[in-house]
Amino acid sequence: MFLDGSTGAGKSRSLLIPTIDLLTYGADDGESRPQTIIVSDVKSELIELTGDELERRGYRVLLLDAQHPEKSDTFNPLEMVDRLANGGNLPGAEQAADAVARTLIAGEGDAKASHWTESARSLLAATILLVVLDEGCPRGCKHLATVYHIMCLGTEGAGEDPCEPLKGLFRSLPQGHPARSRASQFISSGGNELRSIVSTLKVNLRIYASAPIARMVSGDDIDPSRILSEKTALFLHVMDEGSPYNAIAAVLFEQLYAAVYSIADAAGGKLPRPVSILGDEWGNLPKVECLPSLLSLGRSYDLFWMGAVQNISQLNKYGERDGRKKILANCGVKVAMKLGEAEDRQYFTELVGKTTRHTMGTSSSRGPSGGTGSTSYSEHADDLIHPWEWTEMSPDKDGVIVVKTAENGVGREHAGCFRAPVCDCTRMPTKEHFDLGTREHEAAKRMEYQARLISRQMGREDGVDLWTPEFEEEAAEPPVADGWSGLFVD
């Protein structure tokens, strides 16, 4: 489901909170089986208003909050890599490390920047595999804070090449080691190329030098396999678009989708419990690589997505050919609430379609001998909703426009274009279910929930253990200049 609504359209209170209520209501032995929900939450409003009731309904309520890590449960992106490696699935561990690196280091547009980006991703994947596969690294140290720690120590050498300690560490690995092959570009780089690779990586990883963030990414409270198997409500605090902290949530989505296949296969082709992703302000997240595939194949596994954006252009990061078009095409339900951009208005005008307008024209004339008259009839196709009409529509007064694609086995009366009324969640049964009410009442409810989240840090230390590999004491000798050295271009 795709939901398009600019700021102030009422997405959260009119649709998202009631949807959370609907998806989690009922008993496991009843006809309406509660689903696992994964919710991106911009203001932490959704968990603060619904968390207490979800716990009473038997849900394990989790929060991933990089802005306030002291409130957050823990999620270790390296845990899946380590689990696959320990299970003897080294190719799977390599793919998982590559996926973490690809998500944490944002892509660039131009070709030159893409080279630095891809090289930095390879170096990050190499360092992740170095940490995970080294038997001398304690399990409690296998996290991103250790990866950044090694990256900094290994690129601050005192010799002519500050990166020689890290290069030497990778050179000391056996030829068949997966970390060495991924570090090859880094090992052979120098000059401006080397500086660009290292700086790109450090800029994207520096947040893991923070002690609270390091603690947040060092534990396994949030386990993708467990979330997909148990009755869980996971809330992800999403920050402004472009924030590096959002990449942690994007990694979690990638690992959740990667775990779907093995869990569904073990359960006969379906997940043990249906899972719905409610993506409020989905455009704030960095590119989630698996989203197009999730929309194409997820429903067959009982995995569903409802994404809310402020405008369609927020999907441009997925690319026009195989990304954005594929996402929109695979959303069987599209909802227009309040369209602020011309592109969005034009898109939904074309999507809603046209109607036939019948017109009648009359004419008359007078002359010396009297008057004559004629009547003509015509018909023409016209937009059902003109682009300019969207600006005059208000969801609370005019409802929302829903376009639903026909499905096999579902009657035609359930497909087409509809105008659906919406209202605030305090005018629905959801009000009693989640104890909602006046602004003052809800503000007090939210503050009480925040206080309980903050109490988690009482008596808890943010420090984490770091592992330091044995770097070579002496840097390797620099290459001897020869007749070819002048051909090297930085």
Predicted region positions:
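P-loop NTPase motor domains
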Residues: 2-303, 389-416, 421-490
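Conserved ATP-driven motor cores of ASCE-family P-loop NTPases powering translocation/secretion/packaging/pilus
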Residues: 295-297, 301-401, 465, 482-488
